[in-house]
Amino acid sequence: MTKGILGRKIGMTQVFGENGELIPVTVVEASQNVVLQKKTEEVDGYNAIQVGFEDKQAYKKGSKSNKYANKPAEGHAKKADTAPKRFIREFRNVNVDEYELGQEVSVDTFETGDIIDVTGVSKGKGFQGAIKRHGQGRGPMAHGSHFHRAPGSVGMASDASKVFKGQKMPGRMGGNTVTVQNLEVVQVDTENSVILVKGNVPGPKKGLVEITTSIKKGNK
């Protein structure tokens, strides 16, 4: 069955494995995960849990009302006896019997050695050319060349008389939802609500990431 949790990417560091191997890891903090809703096949047509992450900022300290949450959001969170959440995600194909409304989902959901998929929003690079954005080759950089980093031909002449859709051209790069599959959980620190993931994960520091059981875990 699938397991899932939301967290924030803290950064990267290195740890030593049992055999002395130096392993690059990404530190993900995953606290304040609360089950907001349970969905069952009988009622909703599929099994899933809805998890909220991080409380929305209140209007003022000690106030019951929330500046950044409307009444539907407050009512939805109230059913789980919790505060309105900033991020809400749904995890399908889970064993809903293992979860209760308002239950906190902690990092011990995963164990050392688990194979996971991590989803995040890639770093935004702004407007970039075709070479950086799509990996196209450049022209000669000599003084006699008139073609250095230009994208080159984008289509045919009179036969088509247009540029086809999907042509790789300069444009906005990054800021896309990216999933890196088959990463290994190196360590789970329940005391600090931290998961160490082997390798790098998408997004900048403090970026939101979604950790789920690997959909291809049998392939590694």
Swiss-Prot record:
GO terms for cellular component: cytosolic large ribosomal subunit. Pfam families: Ribosomal_L3. Residues 61-81 are annotated as: Disordered. GO terms for biological process: translation. Keywords: Ribonucleoprotein, Ribosomal protein, RNA-binding, rRNA-binding. Gene3D superfamilies: 3.30.160.810, Translation factors. Belongs to the universal ribosomal protein uL3 family. One of the primary rRNA binding proteins, it binds directly near the 3'-end of the 23S rRNA, where it nucleates assembly of the 50S subunit. Part of the 50S ribosomal subunit. Forms a cluster with proteins L14 and L19. HAMAP family: Ribosomal_uL3_B. This is Large ribosomal subunit protein uL3.
